[in-house]
Amino acid sequence: MPVLHNRISNDALKAKMLAENEPRTTISFYKYFTIADPQTTRDALYKLFTALNVFGRVYLAHEGINAQISVPESHVDKFRQQLYSFDPALNNLRLNIALDDDGKSFWVLRMKVRERIVADGITDPDFDASNVGNYLQAAQVNAMLDDPDALFIDMRNHYEYEVGHFENAMEIPADTFREQLPKAVEMMQEHKDKKIVMYCTGGIRCEKASAWMKHNGFEKVWHIEGGIIEYARKAREQGLPVRFIGKNFVFDERMGERISEDVIAHCHQCGTPCDSHTNCKNDGCHLLFIQCPVCAEKFNGCCSELCCTESALPPEEQRRLRAGRENGNKIFNKSRGRLNTQQGIPELKI
């Protein structure tokens, strides 16, 4: 029986991927449909994906599948055929092809069974995730943006919204989707008569969010088909104005796709215009934050002087410090407003 989990170190896998000569295509897709046995489905897909040298991150649950993957260019057609024939529910599934892709988004295949394919915190047994809002395509999105009766709601996290969003879109300030859902209902109560347009990166979050809004009494609810990725692709193909401003954050090694040339965010350390996310190089931190090239050199890729100093210590001393640190200090904290001021990052006023 083949091994159904990776057993090679991350460093070795990344080096192997970077040495590849064949171009790769970054693809994302999702589908809400009933999977009776997620573990068996997971194992079968793992074998299929491994045979095609697919890398990436795949989640399965009884409610469906959510995947962000990298496929060798020569295998894309075969991958599509095998995925479509794997289950009738996946036939002709929309595949979101990355917009700004160097083919180096993933270097290992990780496939996990979870309670939900996107953590939503919903416990209401009467909630019907299939009762979603109306889909909007690119031209319709642009028309809605010009409709004074429409409100665009960004269902992504704070750090995603910070580097790019649709014109005049409302942010639901939170670091997780499960935090956003109740906040969205609360914030939109005074706008129940408006047209609510929800969007996210690839469609999976805004689709479920649209169903949640309808479950909570909102009647005029839309969401963008395929999310930002599909909107930008179709708008460009059809010669339409692209009304998304800035960069689309993505959850892989690239950390972003350039949609427009606008830079709407700022370096979290010095305040200069910048929209490049990075993870703090200190292994005891790994905070996700925005850092300009000047600060990257000044702080050696770290988020603070404290982390810069710590990352320069001998490995044994770094491990000792990490072992003695409270778990609270290890939280992957993503909001700029909580940028570990105790670690030497001053609060930034922009």
Curated annotation (Swiss-Prot):
Keywords: Oxidoreductase, tRNA processing
EC number in record: 1.14.-.-
Domain Rhodanese, first and last residues per copy: 146-240
GO terms for MF: oxidoreductase activity, acting on paired donors, with incorporation or reduction of molecular oxygen
GO biological process: tRNA modification
Main EC class the enzyme belongs to: oxidoreductase
Keyword Cell inner membrane applies: no
Keyword Translocase applies: no
PROSITE patterns in the cross-refs: RHODANESE_3
Domain of life per record: Bacteria
Gene3D superfamilies per UniProt: 3.30.70.100, Rhodanese-like domain (3.40.250.10)
List of catalytic residues: 200
Catalysed reactions listed for this entry: uridine(34) in tRNA + AH2 + O2 = 5-hydroxyuridine(34) in tRNA + A + H2O
Pfam families: Rhodanese, Rhodanese_C, UPF0176_N
Role according to the record: Catalyzes oxygen-dependent 5-hydroxyuridine (ho5U) modification at position 34 in tRNAs.
Protein family according to the UniProt entry: Belongs to the TrhO family.
Name this polypeptide is given: tRNA uridine(34) hydroxylase
This protein's encoding gene: trhO
